[in-house]
Amino acid sequence: MKNIQHHYNFVVVGGGLAGICAAVTAARNGIRTALVQDRPVLGGNSSKEIRVPPVGATQCNFAYSRETGLIEELFLNNLYNNPTWSPEGWNLELESIVRNEPNIDLFLNCAVSEVKTVKYDRYNPECQNLKVVSVKAYCAMAETWHIFKAPFFADCSGDGIVGSGAGAFFKYGIEAASEYNEPFCPEESKMETMGMSLQLKARDTGRPIPFKKPKWIDFELNEADFGPYRPVNEHFFPDTGGFWWLEWGGELDTVHDTIQIKDEVQKITIAVWDYLKNRSPLAEKLITYELDWLGAVPGKRESRRFLGDHVLTMGDISEQFHFEDAVAYGGWGFDHHPAGGFHDKINPSTHHYLRGPHNIPLRSLYSKNIVNLFFAGRNISASHYALSSTRVMLTCAQLGEAVGMAAFNAIKYKCLIKNLLEAEKMKAIQQDLFKADHHIHGYNTTLSNDISSMATVNASSEFRGENLGETWGTEPLTEDRMQLLTIVSNYIDYIKVRLDAEENTVLSYAFFQGPANASTFPEKELFRSKVEVKKGKNQRIDLPVLCEIINKGWHFLIFDANPDINLYIVESPPGLLRYYPRPFDPIRPNQFSKWTLRSLQIGQQKAADADGAMVAAPSWNRFAYENKNISTFLNFSFDCVVHPLQMVYESKMILNPHSRPTNMPNLWVSEKTSFKDSEWISLTWEKPREIERIQIIFDSSLQFHFSQSWQGYSVHAIPTIVKEYKILACMADGTENEIIHVKNNYKRNCLHETNIKNVLTIKLLCFATHGIERAQVYSLRILEKSGNTTFS
């Protein structure tokens, strides 16, 4: 046996999305980091071994909530390099983002087996807190023991191997309702968790392929075994999976009984394929299909939850509690899975939608009694039902990024984790996260060395909301429809709507105010009326809206169903968005809104939305089919123009502290253009400045959320992102210098080191996008020279 001892500033155990984001974030800030993973690949539940598609905060109740920061960088890299979204390509992206960082050493196939601790204050007999000194991991492939020493550790392992070995306090199972006043919990606590799943993938071989169930699968499934809540014949996607509900094991110990649980879930999964292939209504269609891949590693949902100085609860999430130490956000609903899994004939999941995004405090991301141990992922300090929301992978990625930044600041300030709660240090963490394009819901963070707000802003043009461009087709008002609008005036006179009328008819409509918490659903009715519409094509009808605007921001126009009316569909900037009603679903109840968004699939007879509903597709026109490839990512609305015109896309919007829609779009948008001449925006100061860095945040269509199955896309980049741009610096001596010229950008967050002096004006010129005919920019941050911190 070989023994190797390693010394680092920060050791991250667990190579899922939380661990990757923690390690990369720390490393990019100069921290020498080890990433220790017990599997041969990175990615955790999203890896090619398990293949659970990552999901997060993007929900119909708050449309523009996709996670940004490091996970957005990963997704945009993956789209560019791996547009087919293959699991192999995804794993290559994950490994590349780690191996490309010079401050990270990656240790794959290294399983932690021992954690060494010491008493933190050995001179104080009353102090029971411990400190992790080292973790020991074994690599069987190389017959080598690795001992990792560091001042700080992060347990991102899911089950919490470091926390458990260190003696960190933890909880397991479902609390009683009275413990945290959580109404969904049982009266008495239970030692039950959510179970584990295996995925499978089938492929069409083009010739008949038989399947015979192995003898060791000692049961056979038929239609009745699926019950009313697992309509496998309706929701089976042979090429991409769709088997999250093949779940079991929550009544066992999801740590120590993992092998037993995996064996049973494997039996269930193969038995399901046997039914689909040989006896189901799909059997004839699946004659030429074979089982292409079957997961051998179960995807886990829940096991240990380690106690921090705050336990996140249902109330914190549903009430959107304000935390001074907020470092990340979530938005997935309370998604509880019954412990019995597949063998329970009840709902495989009950998903209660949230009113709005919620924040997660740093106090839930470290151990209460281990002074140098962070947690990120599904093992954080949260109640069982709170975890049913925060456990999803894109939220876990946000937690990892926050922990990586907290570790950087703990080392910078040479302090304990708990000392980071001091106001100055917490502000530094939040600013560092903001700089990394990491979002904290409801926080108006600015960078201390950002001088953009001191400048005068000018632009080549500003989108006024009148010219929405080509129509993509029409949508019949066979059901109610809704339009999101952004209102910034104190009143409005009317809304001009483009439509066709098959007969003389009456169009009824209502105007609503949205919630104050940035959610995108109607809450308070302000006006209701109706207008007569004459038979005719391509009409622009004025809808009077006679009301005072109390709260500026999101408002909603609801069209009552009228089968004689067809509304025109256009592509639009953020802040204009169309919705349709979703039938009540007992598995996925939404107490706040009946409205949801449609994920457009041009050419299909039905379009599936992000929440699983199926509705008839619009009548797409020739222009739509010509632009089908980019349509999936675009922001679509009905052709509605508010009067007086709402100037919500002005150049000054790049100075606001938000780099995403909140209750406003918060971005500069140019007028429609062919880009024959560049669209530009500039910042000018009264006196010369010394500029260290320039950061641009482009629009990457945050209303879109990447597929919940491993399907591919027909483009390599988000169509709203500026593809080619140039930065010019106008100097105090009257000269003009080109600072940077990027010809094939596909990223949202673009940071450029400049180190230039005597600058009076910075000008961003946009020459092309990846599809749309406008330039759309959230932020242009100009960062003055500040002190750099390095670590040895």
Q: Can you describe what each PLM-predicted range is?
A:
Residues 468-488, 540-541, 668-687, 749:
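Short beta-strands within extracellular/lumenal beta-sheet-rich domains
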Residues 496-499, 504-521, 573-575, 582, ...:
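Aromatic, loop-rich ligand-recognition surfaces of beta-strand-rich domains
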Residues 7, 25, 31-32, 37-129, ...:
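Conserved N-terminal/central alpha/beta ligand/cofactor-binding core
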Residues 576-666, 671-674, 681:
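PGST-rich, cysteine-poor low-complexity/disordered linker and tail segments that act as flexible spacers
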Residues 4-16:
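Beta1/beta-strand and adjacent pyrophosphate-binding region of the FAD-binding site
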Residues 19:
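N-terminal Rossmann-fold NAD(P) dinucleotide-binding loop
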Residues 45, 123-129, 133, 141-152, ...:
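Flavin (FAD/FMN)-binding glycine-rich loop and adjacent Rossmann-like elements that form
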Residues 483-486, 534-551, 560-564, 738-772:
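Beta-sandwich interaction modules
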